[in-house]
Amino acid sequence: MNMVHKIMANEEAFHLLLAIIIGVIGGLVNMFFLNFVSLIQWLIFQNTGDSAFLAQEAKPFLRVLAPILGGILAGLILLLHSHLSGKKKPTNVLEVVALGDGRIGMRSTLISAWSSLISIGSGASIGREGAITQLTAAFASKWGQTHEWQPYRLRLMVACGAAAGLAAAYNAPIAGALFAALVLVGNFSMNLFAPLVMSSVVATMVSRFWFGIDPWYVLPESMNFDQATNFTSMLWFLILGITSGASGAFFLKSIQKMETISAKSPWP
């Protein structure tokens, strides 16, 4: 007990302890989410795997019908929730960490996660990392609200949840920690960065315990790394980076434009 009291008295050590627990939550969220996705895929396709594999193996009518019906059902869930719920708490992780007090709406997050589950399980080509990151951050926020943490601690733990969720989803602890530090917290000071790293590493360890250490994306066996690192290849990588950045900016602008148009439309 003396050790526990010492850890709780030292704020930085206490934050590391909280980060470890949130990392475990992130790994478990990833495990349950992906298993539910596999269950939905099996019910629809009698098969499991990524969207491309399912489309290749599925019957022709299912390739078209399953994503359409899944998208309609997922949209109806969100639409029904928006009509039945009153004033909703924010669910955007960046918003609650950078501008808010770290409070995330749990109900809205769970509804959004169910919608994502149905979309992904029915073959939609959307990323799983968004829902897993959001769910882990929401659980961290709910835990902190239950214990009445101060806003500065609550924001940090929500960022740890986002880092853990992303790290577990992609088996990438460094990416999870850097994402939270750069995008959410915007600070690399050790007292903030260390908990993010701890959550990411623990979440990845829990995820690897269940799914193994294999990477999500496998490079072709024919790839020659000596050729990939010569000067000519570097020029192509430079062009690829510029093109990817421009495409990403265009995509984000397009989303913002469509959100503006949708908000003005009377149609759901």
Question: What are these language model-derived features?
Answer:
Residues 1-268:
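Alpha-helical transmembrane segments and immediately membrane-proximal extracytoplasmic
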